[in-house]
Amino acid sequence: MVVRGDGALMSERLARTRPIETILSGPAASLVGAATLTKLHEAVVSDIGGTTTDIAVLEGGRPRLSPSGARVGGHRTLVEAVDMETVGLGGDSWARWRRDGTGLVLDLGPERALPLCRAATMFGAPILDALKASLAALRPTPEDGVFVMEAGETPKPFTDATGDRRTRAAVLRALVSGQMRRVAFTPTDALHVLGQHSAWHREAAMLGAALLARQRDGHGQAAVGSPEALAERVRTALVERSATTVLSAAFAADGATEAAAALAHPDVPFHTTLRAAMAGQRAAGVLTAGLGYPLVGLGAAAGAVYGDVAKTLNTEPVLP
């Protein structure tokens, strides 16, 4: 049997005859599995993977369906499928600093990177030696701890692979097209630093965190005081982004498109108000923001972050 895009089952024979019915079958299968494991009839389900987070609503024990059918590349297929919100946020989201005036802002994704801890497990000494060399340099650069790689090749430090302006432009184009892959610090590395994940090379994650921690703002001050503080900053950013994303998807599923759009655009004043409410900040005017259903967290990083995400959204976490 094969799961259809709407969460129902179909035979293998029918799937071969009408493969279009399997659009979004993977996420739909996750939702059906979540419903089976949790026995919940109503829930918001968020599945955090390496590249993306998929969010959908369970009602009556089944996934809520999209009224307009699945969309592929902006085109309506008219095929019944799960009403799902997908955002570029996951365990492999690229974490880096962005200069904002004289300060630094931590960005997560939407670009994906191979985590440093995993790259060191795969390729060994070349990764560790390059990270240590960058840490030994007197001055930090934004490219410290960033590598690029082609399929089947050992990653090279970004600065070594981009010797001149023309080569740099070519490498950046190759990263966008997928011909090359970025290796850099990610939330997966942060969880290794904090001892909440142990699948791969913790030393590489620690070195990457140290390189990010010593990046300088416009006043010449280090971004944070230690690798552990940097890792906690990244984990906190993942929690906040996940909470905002889940709440936005819940609003969208309920038809509250203006509220969903406000959360998707940080420059909208309402976004700031909701963020303050989610953070529990005191103010003269109080706004409560959260979920009316339990939050089911799926994916490798769910156990490390979704307890705090649910707390932020004033709901119960369920981690099957």
Question: Which residues fall in each region the model found?
Answer:
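N-terminally biased helix-coil "hinge/interface" segments that flank
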Residues: 1-320
